[in-house]
């Protein structure tokens, strides 16, 4: 299994997925991994399915579909792959969900009533600051591409301003690490109302950094609808008087 793909997948799950634990009627614990995307991005779910060779795609409604890895597939296919490559989730919520799953596997706990109140952290990496993430998480760039597929935006506004943004609720250290990947001229925006952080770039020199990252660096590529969005975004930049002198990838 391609480790770059797995790192990309971890980033996508951190953004648009969750590990769901439920108590069955007989008291046993069941875990499912769910990734939900817009139906226009069904191709991304199909791509992941083709790489993992496990999982099921279900239509939620007229807008969304989901890829589900059920209990056995999650525990005995995906988890061993992640552990063998030292891949861990980076957002607080997903890390907590994964810790619970790992605890039940390590201690062979099958019934809900046997779960302790406190679950240990299984990630061996400690992040006290954004530099820790950049230096210790060797798969961070592949992870970031996955998170962009989930939560990033390549946008062209009506006033012809063109930019790139990515945001998350909470996870301040993680967002600061993303900021340091590009070191843009605009500071991180924080919404007190939504408790969310946003890295947003529109300056010419910052847009060049974005192009360099997604077109010229060697990491996992964008896929699906986000790739289509990026290519359309590049076309918009080429037609813009402000941005057309940037260095672009060859067609």
Spans of model-derived segments:
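Internal intein/HINT superfamily modules and their associated LAGLIDADG
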Residues: 1-251
């Amino acid at each position: 299994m391609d480790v770059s793909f797995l790192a990309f997948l971890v980033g996508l799950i951190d953004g648009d997925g969750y590990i769901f634990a439920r108590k069955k009627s007989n008291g046993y614990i069941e875990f499912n991994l769910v990734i939900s995307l817009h139906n226009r991005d069904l191709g991304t779910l199909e791509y992941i399915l083709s790489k993992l060779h496990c999982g099921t795609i279900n239509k939620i409604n007229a807008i969304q579909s989901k890829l589900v890895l059920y209990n056995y597939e999650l525990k005995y296919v995906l988890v061993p792959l992640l552990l063998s490559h030292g891949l861990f989730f980076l957002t607080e919520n997903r890390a907590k969900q994964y810790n619970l799953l790992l605890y039940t596997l390590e201690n062979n706990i099958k019934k809900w009533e046997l779960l302790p109140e406190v679950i240990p952290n299984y990630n061996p990496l400690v992040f006290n600051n954004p530099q820790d993430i950049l230096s210790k998480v060797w798969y961070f760039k592949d992870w970031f591409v996955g998170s962009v597929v989930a939560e990033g935006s390549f946008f062209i506004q009506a006033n012809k301003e063109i930019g790139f943004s990515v945001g998350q609720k909470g996870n301040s250290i993680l967002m600061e690490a993303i900021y340091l990947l590009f070191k843009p001229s605009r500071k991180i925006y924080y919404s007190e109302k939504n408790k969310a952080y946003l890295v947003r770039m529109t300056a010419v020199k910052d847009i060049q950094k974005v192009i360099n990252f997604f077109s010229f660096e060697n990491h996992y590529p964008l896929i699906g609808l986000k790739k289509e969005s990026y290519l359309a975004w590049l076309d918009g930049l080429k037609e813009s008087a402000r941005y057309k002198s940037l260095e672009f990838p060859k067609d």
